[in-house]
Curated annotation (Swiss-Prot):
Record keywords: Hydrolase, Magnesium, Metal-binding, Nucleotide metabolism, Nucleotide-binding
Reactions mediated catalytically: XTP + H2O = XMP + diphosphate + H(+); dITP + H2O = dIMP + diphosphate + H(+); ITP + H2O = IMP + diphosphate + H(+)
UniProt keyword ATP-binding present: no
Protein name: dITP/XTP pyrophosphatase
Organism: Bacillus cereus (strain ATCC 14579 / DSM 31 / CCUG 7414 / JCM 2152 / NBRC 15305 / NCIMB 9373 / NCTC 2599 / NRRL B-3711)
Residues the record lists as binding Mg(2+): 44, 73
GO CC field: cytoplasm; cytosol
Length: 205
């Protein structure tokens, strides 16, 4: 019997790993994460765009592991802050990464800016890299539009979810159930685009 084809997700975030595992198990693809390869060092994100960082991570790890690797780079883009925090979303308030400090910094920088001028979006770039040298990395992306609230709301999610207002639900992202969030989130939308490509990219159909 042929063993299941493996896909490595370039993250240690188990929430992300579960999202990918649910998608890929429908196609008999086994998902591994960086927890399964403790000797591998994290790739430094030196790109200037989400796409560059996702490709950088996927390509480097694919060559190291000789495996198909999926990497995502995502973050928050706030129009009134000229696109910040952008690719620096995870470390906006500096090292070490701290979600609460990042939220505080965004709220501070938007102080006294009215709600209708606080337009923002979450952006996710997903890159897939293949160990075969002749196959270039491929990429999909997804966005979720909203506004930045003046204070935190909700207990769910992570990152900037408590201050991101989703008009479709009239709630903060952190007030949504996981099903509601997956239906509209940037990563959920990118994953659905990826799902359409699985037969072609992963199964050679």
């Amino acid at each position: 019997m042929e063993s299941m084809k493996q896909v490595v997700v370039a993250t240690k975030n188990m929430g992300k790993v579960r999202e990918f595992a649910e998608l890929f198990e429908r196609f008999d693809l086994e998902v591994k994460s960086l927890h399964d390869f403790p000797h591998i060092e994290e790739v430094e994100e030196t790109g200037e765009t989400f796409e560059e960082n996702a490709i950088l991570k996927a390509d480097s790890l694919s060559r190291q592991l000789n495996a198909i690797v999926i990497a995502d780079d995502s973050g928050l883009i706030v129009d009134a802050l000229n696109g910040k925090p952008g690719v620096y979303s995870a470390r906006f308030a500096g090292e070490p990464k701290d979600d609460q400090a990042n939220i505080d910094k965004v709220l501070q920088e938007l102080n006294e800016i009215p709600f209708d001028k606080r337009k923002a979006r979450f952006y996710c770039a997903l890159a897939v890299a293949f160990p075969e040298g002749d196959k270039k990395p491929v990429i999909v992306n997804g966005t979720c539009e909203g506004f930045i609230l003046e204070q935190r709301r909700g207990e769910n999610g992570f990152g900037y979810d408590p201050i991101f207002y989703v008009e479709e639900y009239k709630k903060a992202m952190a007030e949504l159930s996981s099903d509601e969030k997956n239906a509209i989130s940037h990563r959920g939308r990118a994953l659905r685009k990826l799902e359409e490509k699985i037969p072609e990219w992963f199964l050679g159909e």
